[in-house]
Amino acid sequence: MSKNKLSASSGRWLKEHFDDKYVLEAQKRGYRSRAIFKLEEIQNKDKLLKPGMTVVDLGAAPGGWSQYAVEQVGDSGQVIACDILAMDSIAGVSFLQGDFREEAVLDALLERIQPDMVDVVMSDMAPNMSGNPSVDQPRSMYLVELALDMCRQVLAPNGSFTVKVFQGESFDAYLQEVRKVFKVVKIRKPDSSRARSREVYIVATGYKG
């Protein structure tokens, strides 16, 4: 791709981004990213987050989901967040920076969590996209498998799980896997999710334990 084409493409993306009503609304309300509106829409429909809950937020940076979650769980709840990228501190959020795929980071995260104490695991994780679906999709599915494994280790009975998944190879098999361990499983495509994106959110409630 030529430099001019790249610049034109980048310019279009920037214009779309800054003209985006969700970006503007996030800035207006003091949230760190437009992604908060995806979680807000899920919350409005599925009521996953309640005062006093313990929540694990995977792929948390820059912190929009953690900001919203800590508002919902209140002072009596807690949010434990993890991301490979740095994240500015948020009151009420315990943040661990590290690569969730590495065993040492996973162990450090688990040290902050007692078994069966987590009410909600939420994941907005995504790999760095190469633009090649045959590479990106397996990387993405690996992350969502890890998120489901986290549920098996820390979720309380009847706990909930919401995870971003890209539709493509292995999506149906993953959905069946989630259905084995949760009583109710729904697929959400929030209005704030860009139409061209293959992303959807699996919302699972009633962890069987």
From Swiss-Prot:
<keyword id="KW-0949">S-adenosyl-L-methionine</keyword>
<feature type="binding site">
    <location>
        <position position="83"/>
    </location>
    <ligand>
        <name>S-adenosyl-L-methionine</name>
    </ligand>
</feature>
<dbReference type="GO" id="GO:0005737">
    <property type="term" value="C:cytoplasm"/>
</dbReference>
<dbReference type="InterPro" id="IPR050082">
    <property type="entry name" value="RNA_methyltr_RlmE"/>
</dbReference>
<feature type="binding site">
    <location>
        <position position="65"/>
    </location>
    <ligand>
        <name>S-adenosyl-L-methionine</name>
    </ligand>
</feature>
<comment type="function">
    <text>Specifically methylates the uridine in position 2552 of 23S rRNA at the 2'-O position of the ribose in the fully assembled 50S ribosomal subunit.</text>
</comment>
<dbReference type="Pfam" id="PF01728">
    <property type="entry name" value="FtsJ"/>
</dbReference>
<keyword id="KW-0963">Cytoplasm</keyword>
<dbReference type="GO" id="GO:0008650">
    <property type="term" value="F:rRNA (uridine-2'-O-)-methyltransferase activity"/>
</dbReference>
<feature type="active site" description="Proton acceptor">
    <location>
        <position position="164"/>
    </location>
</feature>
<keyword id="KW-0808">Transferase</keyword>
<keyword id="KW-0698">rRNA processing</keyword>
<protein>
    <recommendedName>
        <fullName>Ribosomal RNA large subunit methyltransferase E</fullName>
        <ecNumber>2.1.1.166</ecNumber>
    </recommendedName>
</protein>
<feature type="binding site">
    <location>
        <position position="124"/>
    </location>
    <ligand>
        <name>S-adenosyl-L-methionine</name>
    </ligand>
</feature>
<feature type="binding site">
    <location>
        <position position="99"/>
    </location>
    <ligand>
        <name>S-adenosyl-L-methionine</name>
    </ligand>
</feature>
<keyword id="KW-0489">Methyltransferase</keyword>
<comment type="similarity">
    <text>Belongs to the class I-like SAM-binding methyltransferase superfamily. RNA methyltransferase RlmE family.</text>
</comment>
<feature type="binding site">
    <location>
        <position position="63"/>
    </location>
    <ligand>
        <name>S-adenosyl-L-methionine</name>
    </ligand>
</feature>
<dbReference type="InterPro" id="IPR029063">
    <property type="entry name" value="SAM-dependent_MTases_sf"/>
</dbReference>
<dbReference type="InterPro" id="IPR015507">
    <property type="entry name" value="rRNA-MeTfrase_E"/>
</dbReference>
<dbReference type="InterPro" id="IPR002877">
    <property type="entry name" value="RNA_MeTrfase_FtsJ_dom"/>
</dbReference>
